[in-house]
Curated annotation (Swiss-Prot):
Part of the 30S ribosomal subunit. Contacts proteins S5 and S12. One of the primary rRNA binding proteins, it binds directly to 16S rRNA central domain where it helps coordinate assembly of the platform of the 30S subunit. This is Small ribosomal subunit protein uS8. Pfam families: Ribosomal_S8. It comes from Neorickettsia sennetsu (strain ATCC VR-367 / Miyayama) (Ehrlichia sennetsu). Keywords: Ribonucleoprotein, Ribosomal protein, RNA-binding, rRNA-binding. GO terms for cellular component: ribonucleoprotein complex; ribosome. NCBIfam families: PRK00136.1 (NF001109).
Length: 131
């Protein structure tokens, strides 16, 4: 099991997009389910499904999205990692790719995209950016 489930999930999604895979499998956690739901809501993935391999062992299957043969996710950049956490107040949340992409934050209100965190005046840990 990797040290950071979020970093592992971001790497698997990025590698799956570069290899033009239809779906990737990532480890299961409540945070990763919230992240998958957010990516689906924002239109970056087709969908996700939680499967149970055996009792108490679950995985998340993420179906990747393509448009005209090109991946919808062109950049996926990890901000925080276990050795260096990056926190931001609501007024200081950076724009990812000049506002074309979104930054994903872990806040007290759950996992939120940058524009929802700013509108609800809620800062938190910057997890990754997607464009």
């Amino acid at each position: 099991m990797p040290n950071s489930l979020i970093a592992d999930a971001v790497a698997r999604i990025r590698n799956g997009q570069m290899a033009r895979l239809r779906e990737v499998t990532i480890y299961h956690s409540r945070v990763l389910v919230e992240i998958a739901a957010l990516l689906k809501e924002e239109g970056y993935i087709v969908g996700y499904e939680v499967i149970e391999i055996r009792p108490s062992v679950k995985r998340i299957i993420i179906r990747l999205k393509y448009y005209c043969g090109q991946p919808v996710i062109s950049k996926l950049k990890l901000f925080s990692r276990p050795g260096k956490r990056i926190y931001s107040r609501a007024c200081e949340i950076p724009k990812f790719y000049g506002g074309l992409g979104i930054s994903v934050l872990s806040t007290s209100k759950g996992i939120l995209p940058s524009y929802k965190a700013v509108s609800s005046n809620c800062g938190g840990e910057l997890l990754f950016g997607v464009y």
